């Protein structure tokens, strides 16, 4: 029984153009400056299976009857081996099974050399595990490489013993087939050698560009769709269409960036590279439309206003939701999301989008406002009350009635339009119904606080000037503080010196007083001694009890 490849289960309706909707009143919203710029389908995606592509990096040359020696091929082989050697060594380090006696980390039953990964995220470790798993099937991969080595077809599907589908891609074989095979017998060997060398050198340059980041660590840096496009060349769309088996437009898938590749293994013997292509699983939400809205300023009682509406909405089952799509991938025709980002909108805004313009909320604009015109679907939408709208072909000035919110200018009205200094070539006819009976003057408009851009700018300038003044005052006080601090320091030093001086003077005075006292004592002692010497009889009689010294 034939096994279908489990890589992708996709439910998709081919995008053929989405017409106007019933939930959003696009024609009526034009009166207040709301334009539907783009309508896209809503797609959900999740991680899917993987497909494997074998890239043959060396072409097969047709036989030359033994008369030609193609030296450029040998040089290419040597250079290519040098280029791929770091990749081969790195893949070997990641996939090497650590000895059971040493410390190991196991993921999904395989052993990953974590030292080769360094600091890795969960996704990067998952990629490394994929490399290890692929190397566990090295025998099947080698058999696969051998089976495609002799073919010179650009794309050939082969199935290994495990019934795993892989695609052998020889990106440069197309060049070889077209440039060499038909003329191998009619030109000189040197010319063929030079031609082959130029082709191989160009491809080497592309390979160097592709594998610049992978040389560091292929497990941590997946191949982008741009790298895959360079690597697989013109065969990429064929590979995708044959392998994905889906109605999803190939260009749409490629532009989404959701298709990535991972280098799994390299065969040095055959110079073949095994790449794992990761393709998400897609499913479309039937009947859902993601609509981009552009709101330009409109005229209301000779005042410039802008309506408050979301930038992007989701229309589904006659309901409207705000849909920013911040975590989604937006392509020209689809929005790819992992989950629904829709959120409710206010009732007044909902009624406004449904066509009840009296429920719309506007913000007055004072000053310059850049969103005064929009160019969508080949038609110009402009607020010609706030802009000078001049038609260059045929020459005339476009006037806008006071009751009209905006002016809609198609090719019937003007083929080349001048808005101030901008020039637009109008290419389409406006075929929607413009509700001319709606008057902005009679509308029951709910105003928010005015958005005065000029005053806001002046306020900002005043704040900046005030900040500069405060900074200048701060610097002045800081300088004053530094000056005062200096004076305080000098005063403190002077005070300390004064105290020291007073202490020294006090000590000197005390010393002088003590010295004078000692001098007085010395003088008294000297006088007593002198009197004793001059009157010895007095002291002798006195010593016997006769105080007067008379016998």
From Swiss-Prot:
Site location (Cleavage): 106-107
Keyword Transmembrane helix annotated: yes
Places the protein is found: Virion membrane; Host cell membrane
PTM (free text): The inactive precursor F0 is glycosylated and proteolytically cleaved into F1 and F2 to be functionally active. The cleavage is mediated by cellular proteases during the transport and maturation of the polypeptide.
Keyword annotations from UniProtKB, A to Z: Cleavage on pair of basic residues, Coiled coil, Disulfide bond, Fusion of virus membrane with host cell membrane, Fusion of virus membrane with host membrane, Glycoprotein, Host cell membrane, Host membrane, Membrane, Signal, Transmembrane, Transmembrane helix, Viral envelope protein, Viral penetration into host cytoplasm, Virion, Virus entry into host cell
Transmembrane segments: 493-513
Any one GO CC term of the record: viral envelope
Family recorded in the similarity comment: Belongs to the paramyxoviruses fusion glycoprotein family.
Role according to the record: Class I viral fusion protein. Under the current model, the protein has at least 3 conformational states: pre-fusion native state, pre-hairpin intermediate state, and post-fusion hairpin state. During viral and plasma cell membrane fusion, the heptad repeat (HR) regions assume a trimer-of-hairpins structure, positioning the fusion peptide in close proximity to the C-terminal region of the ectodomain. The formation of this structure appears to drive apposition and subsequent fusion of viral and plasma cell membranes.
Record-given protein name: Fusion glycoprotein F0
Gene name of the encoded protein: F
């Amino acid at each position: 029984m034939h096994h279908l490849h489990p890589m992708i289960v996709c439910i998709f309706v081919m995008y053929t153009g989405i017409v106007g909707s019933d939930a959003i009143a696009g024609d009526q919203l034009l009166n207040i400056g709301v334009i539907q710029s783009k309508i896209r389908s809503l797609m959900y995606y999740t991680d899917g299976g993987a497909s494997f592509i074998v890239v043959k990096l060396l072409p097969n040359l047709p036989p030359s009857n033994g008369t030609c020696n193609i030296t450029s091929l040998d040089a290419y082989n040597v250079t290519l081996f040098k280029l791929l050697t770091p990749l081969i060594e790195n893949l070997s380090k990641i996939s090497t099974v650590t000895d059971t006696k040493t410390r190991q980390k196991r993921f999904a039953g395989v052993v990953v050399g974590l030292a080769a990964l360094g600091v890795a995220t969960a996704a990067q470790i998952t990629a490394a595990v994929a490399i290890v798993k692929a190397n566990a099937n090295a025998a099947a991969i080698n058999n696969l490489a051998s089976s495609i080595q002799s073919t010179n077809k650009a794309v050939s599907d082969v199935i290994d013993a495990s019934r795993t589908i892989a695609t052998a891609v020889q990106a440069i074989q197309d060049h070889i087939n077209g440039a060499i095979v038909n003329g191998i017998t009619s030109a000189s060997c040197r010319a063929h050698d030079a031609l082959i060398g130029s082709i191989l050198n160009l491809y080497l340059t592309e390979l160097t560009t592709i594998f610049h980041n992978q040389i560091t660590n292929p497990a941590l840096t997946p191949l982008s769709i741009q790298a895959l496009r360079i690597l697989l060349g013109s065969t990429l769309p064929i590979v995708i269409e044959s392998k994905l088996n889906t109605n999803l437009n190939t260009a749409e898938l490629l532009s989404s960036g959701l298709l990535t590749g991972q280098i799994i293994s390299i065969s040095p013997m055959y110079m073949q590279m095994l790449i794992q292509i990761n393709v998400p699983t897609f499913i479309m939400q039937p009947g859902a439309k993601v609509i981009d809205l552009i709101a330009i300023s409109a005229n209301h009682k000779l005042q410039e206003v802008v309506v408050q509406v979301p930038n992007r909405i989701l229309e589904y089952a006659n309901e409207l939701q705000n849909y920013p799509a911040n975590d989604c991938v937006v392509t020209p025709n689809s929005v790819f999301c992992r989950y629904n980002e829709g959120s409710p909108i206010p009732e007044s805004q909902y009624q406004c989008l449904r066509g009840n313009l009296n429920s719309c909320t506007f913000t007055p604009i004072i000053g310059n406002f850049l969103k005064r015109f929009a160019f969508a679907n080949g038609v110009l939408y402009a607020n010609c009350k706030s802009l000078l709208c001049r038609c260059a072909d045929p020459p005339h000035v476009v006037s806008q009635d006071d009751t009209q919110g905006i002016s809609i200018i198609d090719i019937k009205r003007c083929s080349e339009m001048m808005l101030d200094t901008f020039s637009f070539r109008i290419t389409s006819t406006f075929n929607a119904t413009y509700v001319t009976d709606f008057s902005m003057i009679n509308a029951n408009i709910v105003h928010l606080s005015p958005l005065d851009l000029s005053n806001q700018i002046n306020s900002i300038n005043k704040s900046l000037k005030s900040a500069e003044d405060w900074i200048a005052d701060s610097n002045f006080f800081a300088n004053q503080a530094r000056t005062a601090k200096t004076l305080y320091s000098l005063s403190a030093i002077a005070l300390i010196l004064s105290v020291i001086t007073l202490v020294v003077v006090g000590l000197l005075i005390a010393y002088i007083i003590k010295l004078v006292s000692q001098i007085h004592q010395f003088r008294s002692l000297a006088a007593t001694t002198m009197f004793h010497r001059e009157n010895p009889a007095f002291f002798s009689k006195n010593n016997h009890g006769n105080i007067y010294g008379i016998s």
